[in-house]
């Protein structure tokens, strides 16, 4: 068990480096990795949080169907059991996705979670999809000192919780460089409309070949921006549309989609502000497991070979310091040869700018 002082600092009465606790994955005979997770959480101070009689949201990613890189449910049970020992009422949670797949509404999302092993017998607590059936059950909360987002649209169950814990699989990501704690919180806790605000600078579009003409999207639109053409296909008036994304959640046929046109730099900034909104004003604790470091997000229905060796478990009260510590550890690791990163490094003239992500 090691403690490291991350390079980020928290603003208190006096400035001091944030503490991030770390343990590796080495488990000699008689040593349990699950016990090591428990011990690093305790060392980092999870038992300092008063959980007695309080709802505890444990935010994690249940993995897209077909993906095998997501965190095992056994890890979630360790964290849930720690919460229950302290009198807490934990639940695992995530929000619906903006795009088509196996997690775009609560019913499919719950089925996906169960098929991937997340249900009360394996995790010790219930699973709640935080933004409801269609991804429209949200709370609009202020962003502290927000520059790019003044408010954030967060899954209501997450904001209803008294305590927030993130349990993150740290890996690569095709848009944000890496997917860590801030992404798990910021993007993951956004409702479908919240995800659209982070991803897109514009408005949703209609793929008319998929439109069934059911008119449900028009009923959900608060701006009267949706009409129907001569073929009974939805048309969005971009001059009236406010970009709330409720029509995306209303469509059962994946006919309405976000253009996802925010630049990656802007996406990262919005995501960080959303994470700040989720964490503000209540006790929070964060755990990241740096293992099965796939090059892309667990949102894919597949996962490529890891680009780096398994590194360890990190825990902290500071999500920024936690991401910094995980990223630093990855940048100091030797890339694996039979991987996307290893193959890229072997290409003549390919430049990774000293960054494994």
PLM regions with names:
Residues 2-14:
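Short, Lys/Arg-enriched N-terminal segments with co-localized hydrophobic residues
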Residues 16-67, 71-75, 85-93, 99-357:
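Extended, low-polarity segments enriched in aliphatic/aromatic residues
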């Amino acid at each position: 068990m090691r403690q490291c002082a991350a390079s980020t600092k928290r603003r208190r009465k006096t400035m001091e480096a944030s503490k991030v606790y770390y343990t590796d994955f080495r488990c000699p005979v008689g040593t349990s990795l699950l016990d090591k997770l428990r011990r690093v959480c305790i060392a980092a101070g999870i038992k300092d949080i008063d959980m007695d009689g309080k709802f505890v949201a444990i935010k994690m990613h249940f993995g897209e169907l077909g993906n095998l890189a997501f965190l095992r449910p056994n890890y979630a049970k360790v964290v849930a059991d720690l919460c229950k020992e302290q009198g807490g009422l934990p639940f695992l949670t995530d929000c619906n996705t903006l795009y088509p797949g196996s997690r775009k509404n609560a019913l499919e999302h719950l089925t996906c979670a169960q098929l991937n092993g997340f249900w009360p017998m394996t995790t010790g607590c219930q699973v709640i999809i935080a933004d409801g059936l269609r991804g429209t059950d949200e709370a609009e909360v202020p962003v502290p000192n927000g520059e790019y987002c003044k408010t954030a649209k967060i899954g209501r169950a997450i904001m209803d919780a008294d305590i927030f814990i993130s349990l993150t699989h740290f890996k690569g990501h095709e848009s944000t460089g890496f997917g860590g704690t801030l992404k798990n919180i910021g993007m993951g806790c956004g409702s479908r409309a919240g995800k659209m605000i982070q991803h897109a600078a514009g408005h949703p579009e209609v793929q008319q070949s998929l439109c069934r003409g059911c008119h449900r999207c028009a009923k959900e639109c608060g701006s009267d921006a949706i009409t129907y053409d001569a073929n009974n296909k939805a048309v969005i008036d971009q001059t009236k549309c406010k970009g709330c994304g409720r029509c995306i959640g209303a469509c059962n046929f994946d006919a309405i989609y976000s253009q996802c046109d925010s630049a990656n730099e802007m996406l990262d900034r919005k995501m960080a502000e959303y994470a700040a909104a989720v964490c503000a004003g209540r006790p929070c604790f964060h755990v990241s497991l740096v293992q099965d470091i796939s090059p892309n997000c667990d949102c894919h229905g597949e996962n490529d070979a890891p680009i780096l060796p398994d590194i360890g478990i990190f825990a902290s009260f500071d999500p920024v310091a936690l991401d910094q510590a995980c990223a630093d550890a990855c940048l100091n690791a030797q890339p694996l040869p039979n991987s996307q990163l290893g193959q890229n490094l072997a290409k003549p003239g390919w430049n990774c700018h000293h960054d494994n992500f």
